[in-house]
Design a protein with these regions (language model features):
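Structural signature of tandem alpha-helical TPR/SEL1-like repeats
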Residues: 12-25, 47-59, 81-93, 114-127, ...
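Helix-start (N-cap) detector for alpha-helical repeat units in TPR-like alpha-solenoids
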Residues: 1, 34-35, 68-69, 101-103, ...
Length: 217
């Protein structure tokens, strides 16, 4: 194994010190290779050394402006720092550099939601689900965006898929109930809100919505 592989293995085993040592040696061995800088940056990010991590990601980008993993890593750091505008910029750069995986599309969608741009987030979350059908959280967030844009029939379909895959997803039951309420399907709305409460008895939003619908009858 080379030093990068040794470092990644050590990092996966939780041996931060050994990983740092290996990545340092990899940088010394190949100072013009962006990969060990990215690896070291990911290590620093994992222990919340955000500023140092950004310095290493930046070094990797200086060495190779198409290093998609460096842009993606920096985007994650800015997300953790709650600087969502910078996070969005770096995730977009990762996309331009050729990265195409579900995590990137999900993170880009999430940053746009944080920036209160759910309409722009929709295609990214949809793509995240297309690339990884097991990503139920991306599917749920996509449903939330659909509901926000009053695309209620599509939201119902999406939330139904979420609860089919995860029958314990209280928020999906709640939002499905709300969507049915807006579609004036009271029986279905009450059924879904009831299921949200079954899963999470202290779900205040579901309890409140259930009460409103019952009082309106």
């Amino acid at each position: 194994m080379n030093y990068n592989e040794i470092g990644i293995e050590a990092l996966n085993q939780g041996n931060i010190e050994k990983a740092a040592e290996a990545f340092t040696k990899a940088i010394e061995e190949s100072p013009k290779d962006p990969v060990p800088y990215i690896n070291f940056a990911n290590l620093l990010s994992s222990i919340n050394e955000f500023e140092r991590a950004l310095n290493f990601f930046q070094k990797a980008i200086e060495l190779d402006h198409t290093a998609a993993a460096a842009y993606y890593g920096a985007g994650n750091v800015y997300t953790l720092k709650e600087d969502f505008m910078k996070a969005k910029d770096y995730f977009e750069q990762a996309l331009k550099a050729g990265m195409e995986n579900s995590d990137l599309f999900y993170m880009l969608g999430q940053t746009l939601i944080k920036l209160e741009q759910p309409k722009l987030a929709m295609p990214y979350l949809q793509r995240a689900v297309e690339l990884n059908e097991e990503d139920n959280e991306a599917r749920f967030q996509f449903g939330m965006c659909l509901a926000n844009e009053h695309m209620l029939e599509e939201a119902v379909t999406t939330f139904t898929e979420v609860i089919t895959r995860d029958p314990q997803h209280a928020d999906a039951f709640y939002n499905l109930g709300v969507a049915y309420a807006y579609l004036e399907k009271k029986d279905e709305a009450l059924e879904m809100l009831g299921k949200a409460i079954d899963v999470q008895p202290d779900h205040m939003l579901a309890l409140h919505a259930q009460k409103l619908i019952q009082e309106a009858e």
